[in-house]
Amino acid sequence: MSERFIKNIKDLKFKPFDNYGKAIEGMNCHKISYDKKNGGFGTYILKMEPGAKSLPHVHQGFEEFYVIDGELQDVDGKIYKKGDFVTFEPGTEHNSLTKNGCLLIVFMRGINKPI
């Protein structure tokens, strides 16, 4: 029989977000099923503190996220708000920032590459 894991978001233990080889200031994650060893497939919760900014990167596979709380602004000015579900197709290049902080659940299908 397979195992089942249940976590309440209030009980998560966040660690520095280091998907590009080094921690990014103001970005922390809790990996649920995400693993680079399986090709970067899986899910994690991402917490971005006010003023945090992701590195510019290109998507090797699909990346989707749901904004649980706060707002996230993409480099092109598009703002994603609480309740938005966003899909990036393979080949998409971008980076994001948050003025007031945000909490996302991220679904990855492939490892992003910094540019």
Description of each model-found segment:
Residues 1-40:
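A short, N-terminal "cap"/entry segment at the start of jelly-roll beta-barrel domains
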Residues 28-59, 89-93:
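Conserved short histidine dyad/triad with adjacent acidic residue
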Residues 40-41, 58-60, 78-79, 98-100:
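Short glycine/proline-enriched turns and hinge-like loops at secondary-structure junctions
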Residues 59-75:
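Glycine- and acidic-residue-biased ligand/ion/polar-headgroup-sensing regions
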Residues 75-93:
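Short acidic-glycine-tyrosine-enriched beta hairpin
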Residues 90-115:
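Ligand-binding loop in jelly-roll beta-barrel domains
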